C-alpha cells in the first residue's frame, strides 16, 4: 500500500489477521482482540493466524476490513474519506466480490471515489507495455494473463492454484526428509525465509540433480533464529522446480511454462507473436534466480521454431502490480 506517484509502496506487510489462542494469557498487556500484518507475524506464538485472501480471492470480509483499516490508519496514516482509492483484484475475480469490495470502501470507509484494477494489467503497465502476457505468481495463486492494448482477455486466463505458499510447504516437507523438523506456523515462516534467500531454478533440472549428488557446490548453510545452523543442498532448486513440474507435489496441473503456452494458444492467431515477444513475470514467486532463462528455454521448446521469444523479468517485479497502480492513479486522464 502507498501513494500514487511514489516509486515504491510505503507499507508492505502480510495479509494476515491473528487472534489470541487463549484469552487472558497476557494479563495487563492491554491485549487486543486482533492483530494485523507484521504484528500478527511477530506474536504468532500466541495467536491463531488467518489468511482472509485465499488463492487471490477475498474469502473473509470481516478480516479483510481489519486489514484495510490497519492500512489506512496505522500504516499510511490517512483518512480514507480524504482521497480516492485504487484497489486491485485477481483476474477472474467474481463480480459479487468486486461489488462487496466497493460497498465496504464506500459504506465503511466513506471513500470519495474508487477504482478496481486487474493486477496483471498493472504489472504490464509497470513494464512499459500495453500488450503482452503476464505470468503473475504470488503467495496463493498464479495466473497467466494475455493482455491486448490494455485489455485482459478473460477467455484465455487459466488460474493455477500453485504459488508461494505451496512451495514453502514443499520445502518444509523435503527439509523434514533431510532430518530437520518444521511444522508450526512459526516454523513455516522460517522456511519461507530459507526459500526466499536460498532457492533458485535450475536451467536443466536432471543435470542439476547429478551435480548435487557428486559435488557440494550447491550446498549453503542457514542460521535458524535459535542459533542452530542447517545445511541445504539440492532442496534449493528442488523447491521451486514444482512451478515447472506440479506433479512433484501430486498436482495434475500443467507447469507455468505450459500454462503460459496454452494461454497464448487460446488467443487470436494474429496477436500470438506480440504475446510470445512480451512475456512479463510478476509477483514474489517469480523472484527465483534463473526463472527467466528457464522459462525462455521451456517456451522456446513449445513454440513454433521461427518464433521470437522474450521473457522479461523486471527487477522490481515483486511490487510491479503496486508500481503499475501508482503510475495509473497518477495520470490526469485517469483521475477524471
UniProtKB/Swiss-Prot annotation:
Annotated PROSITE patterns: ACTINS_1, ACTINS_ACT_LIKE
SUPFAM superfamilies linked to this entry: Actin-like ATPase domain
Pfam families: Actin
UniProt-recorded name of the protein: Actin-52
Catalytic reaction(s) noted: ATP + H2O = ADP + phosphate + H(+)
SMART domains in UniProt: ACTIN (SM00268)
Entry EC number(s): 3.6.4.-
Other noteworthy facts: There are at least 5 different actin genes in tomato.
Biological function: Actins are highly conserved proteins that are involved in various types of cell motility and are ubiquitously expressed in all eukaryotic cells. Essential component of cell cytoskeleton; plays an important role in cytoplasmic streaming, cell shape determination, cell division, organelle movement and extension growth.
GO CC annotations, alphabetized: actin cytoskeleton; cytoplasm
